[in-house]
């Protein structure tokens, strides 16, 4: 709520000139943060040139909640709120409907593939389609709730296995996985 927003703004103000600490805005996900707060945080991030990190379209439960409350998918909901842009790091984006990934492309948000978490859920990110849409994407480890080892080499291996098991064409190459896991 308001107290957490005030704390986040205070944290940013205390560190905004730091050469080593770079605050970001990080609302959890579209089903746990109200539309009002999501918009407020997005506006604050844009006004202060901060990145925003959000877990987006991660689970079927999130999809069902957003569908029942907003009659759309989590990605379309975020897009309709105006919170997707080139400063957004969107973890997951693996429980999607037709048109969702195209909205990520249009908004220039940066999706993060969390292979271990997606593998456990049985719902890997469609990295080939993202690449066809010219959407840049990266590889991450997720949080302790979805992954308990934070091993980037294991995530890279899992990314190869998952992608190549669901790809309809053009398997992802190890060189590409290394780039996605290591570039800024």
Regions inferred by a protein language model and the residue ranges of each:
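His/Asp/Glu-enriched, well-ordered alpha-helical/loop segment
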Residues: 80-87, 128-184
């Amino acid at each position: 709520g308001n107290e957490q927003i005030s704390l986040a703004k205070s944290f940013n103000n205390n560190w905004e000139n730091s050469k080593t600490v770079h605050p970001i805005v990080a609302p959890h996900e579209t089903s746990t943060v109200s539309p009002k707060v999501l918009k407020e945080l997005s506006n604050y991030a844009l006004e202060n040139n901060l990145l925003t990190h959000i877990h987006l379209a991660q689970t079927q439960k999130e999809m069902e909640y957003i569908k029942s409350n907003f009659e759309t998918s989590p990605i379309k909901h975020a897009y309709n709120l105006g919170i997707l842009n080139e400063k957004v790091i969107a973890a997951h984006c693996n429980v999607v409907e037709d048109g969702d990934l195209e909205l990520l492309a249009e908004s220039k948000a940066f999706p993060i593939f969390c292979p271990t978490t997606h593998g456990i859920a049985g719902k890997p990110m469609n990295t080939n389609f993202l690449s066809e849409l010219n959407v840049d994407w990266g590889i991450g480890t997720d949080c302790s709730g979805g992954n308990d080892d934070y091993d980037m080499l294991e995530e890279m291996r899992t990314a190869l296995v998952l992608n190549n098991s669901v790809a309809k064409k053009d398997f992802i190459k190890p060189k590409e996985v290394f780039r996605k896991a290591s570039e800024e």
